[in-house]
Amino acid sequence: MRIFLSLALLFSFSVMAQESTEYKYEVESNKAEYYIGSYKEGKDLEDLTAWYGKFAEWADSKGSTFDKMSVAILTPYFSSDLSTHDVMWVTNTPGPLEQFTGLQEWVTDGLPKLGKSLPVINTQVLDTWQWVVSSPTTTEEGTLMYATYADCSLEDGYNMRQVYDMYKDFAGFAQSQGDTLGRKLIVVESGGQLDEGVDFVRLMYSSSVMERGTNAALYYDKIEGSEASNNLKGFSCSNASSYIGQSMRDYK
């Protein structure tokens, strides 16, 4: 999967419907930054985890600035090309105010102090909006997460807001049957470009590796073929890549 989307697809791309159109749900969104890179020679995940300890100590020294930031370190596992990168460092914040307040602290103080000791060389950094469809059981610190990103295309006659509403309906039914997957629709504000014909990226993630299997079994047993499943339309996804990693920091 070529990781994520083009600048042209920001929020406005999904508000292509007429202003008078009424939708069932208000979009719940958050900002996320993806730092995608490879380890420096002789370095590995253990070194990055140790470096995170320095970062966390620095972040905690900044008062409440980073209280609303989560951090996860994800390693590619199922992928068509594992040579493209070793790791993704993912931060989430509720919105741009929290994101850019923290970013200013990082570039003016944190980066000069910690940048040289970072054991990773980043080859791509993405600034994204994520539309929250459903949430997993937990994202608390220490959670071993399983996350799958897939390229998705809209079908003719559908826009992102329509798809979001249908996906929310589906997720609500799935949760009533015991589903615990988190789901997000991702668009990039800057830093990435999608292949032609790809409109957004879908993230599906669970609070443990085993939980992903439990949810897959539940889908085939109780959800596939249901009215809610049949009503989920307007897009298709392919070219998925899966990651395993740990939640290092959750919202306070």
Where are each of the predicted segments found?
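Positively charged n-region of N-terminal signal peptides that target proteins for export
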Residues: 1-4
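Hydrophobic h-region of N-terminal signal peptides that target proteins for export
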Residues: 8-17
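Short S/T/G/P-rich N-terminal loop/turn motif that feeds into the first structured element of a domain
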Residues: 17-113, 118-252
